[in-house]
Amino acid sequence: MPFAIHELHNAYRAYRQFQDSNPPLHHARYIFPFFRGSYFAYRKVDVLRTVVIAKAISVNPSYVDIGCGYGDFLDKVRQLLPDARGIEKHGSIFYAFQISKPDYINLMSAEDLSESVDVAFVGWMEPGQDFRRFVAKCAKCVVTTFDTGGQCGISSGCEYEEFGFQRVAWWRTPSWIDVNGQLMNRYYTPSLDLGKKEQLAKLRTAHNFWYVYAKPELTARIESGLQWWLKKLEDPNDRFDFESVLD
């Protein structure tokens, strides 16, 4: 997260002003994702699938979230994998706002990874950076997500086949930016009529893509675990409360 401290403070002031306006529930999460959410859109189904993948590898899997920020996605994973950990390169995001850093988040970069882990989750890679080879050295499986308009969606460069991994699965999650037009309606002018909303819904193109890469010896186990989950247990009605903003 390559921000100067003064930029963070300016953003935080804008965030506080927005909160003082008593906005609709969960809107701050998507308008100010740095402070209240994550840089990528996710739903409960994404968390559950990630956990299923980890448990297909081991009964007690090791898991690291690389570039976890304040740990929004990581905290959801930890509800099911209590030993999951995160790493964050920029400690200033905690110190600048006197936010207590959880013990399960270590201040380090992906280049400093040394311990082997069952699953590495990569939800953010700064523009121009490429730390995949460091992740590949330590992880047995990599789950990564990126949006269609980001550096990975446009230019690729987020695949792991060149490091000896095989792509096991992929899916997509509708992203917020073109799902709920009101989120980008800064002054909350009157809502669009139903007909206009239906027209806009047909134009939805922004998505977060999720890709799963694994060492060849693990692909069959992960595929089997995911297929079992999809057929037997996945419930489309099992959602986080903030998902109401996405639909």
Region roles according to the model:
Residues 72-104:
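Class I SAM-dependent methyltransferase SAM/SAH-binding core
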Residues 118-130:
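A short SAM/SAH-binding and catalytic strip from SAM-dependent methyltransferases
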Residues 60-69:
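Conserved class I S-adenosyl-L-methionine
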